[in-house]
Amino acid sequence: FFDPKAEDAANYGGIGAVIGHEIGHGFDDQGSQYDGDGKLNNWWTDEDRKNFEARTGALIAQYNSFVPLQLAEKYADDPDKAPHVNGALTIGENIGDLGGVNIALKAYAFALGKAAGKSDAEEDGSPAAIKALLDTAPEMDGFTGLQRFFLSYASIWRTKNRDELAEQYLQIDPHSPAEFRTNGIASNVDLFYDAFGVTEGDAMWLAPKDRVRIW
């Protein structure tokens, strides 16, 4: 997750996204029900809750459609039997993952701004300002800073399971399979499209209207 000798893109894409993920739990389907004193309290307006549920509902629907690749291959002869991710079971962790990546991207951008002597870098958190700061990252080994961020994020979820365990996890684990903690999240982040030039027709393309942003 973290290497003190690694460059910023790698660490923000690794431990940065994990820290952001944990912060995000304070505002997920469960954490959002508690106030600043840790008391169970509906501190949101009805409109806030309605909008939150609409966005989380869209994320649940996305994840309900996912089948782990290894299980899709296992059930290739009868795809209707292939087990899917449970979007409702995993929604809290998916909110954490999505928020964590967006938080880490902003933090990385602000770090780049400060390194360039822009003391007011954190004053403008607009998408355009964040993208402009990220574009100042030096290229390394043929990859931009933004690309290295996403490559690092993907690398922290590398895993391999037996088919039986993969199926069991779908039933009991509130975390999504690793491939969807990466690809499922990245497909909802506009900066991922900028990083790798993802366009309509590519496997990870989601139309802008279908991309979910909780926060």
Model-derived features: positions:
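Zinc-dependent metallohydrolase catalytic domains
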Residues: 1-16, 26-215
